[in-house]
């Protein structure tokens, strides 16, 4: 969840929905909770490491993920504002597998995304097509890639029809 920006935006613009925001950083969760309180928004924040096995039974209508996707060699391309306000583990992929978070979240969605649910990812421009292929392999449909404000392919949306 990082600073909570995505969760706050979704809650503010979808008042009657329940938002569950997860992060494995206590620091990030403290910041996100503070931001939610400042904006009078009721959000369920939980310390969850998606890469570890857990026994959550919640089924979601929508899963939104902005996992770490920047390579450490690209650190000089990241603005100082981002580097000062986000923990490095929220920004940089710390694995030899650039798709580790995407694979894990797609696998998680098989048992936690409702039939006809939607999944959204923010992606690195160099791996967005690989993420699209993972979604296709896992039987997601209606896959759309969207550009960010700089015209770079950055977001991907896909529908789940169950039994992936």
Language-model-derived ranges and their functions:
Residues 69-101:
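Mobile active-site "lid"/loop adjacent to the S-adenosyl-L-methionine
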Residues 161-164:
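Flexible, glycine-/basic-rich loop-and-beta segments that form/coincide
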Residues 10, 82, 105-109:
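Class I S-adenosylmethionine-dependent transferase superfamily signal
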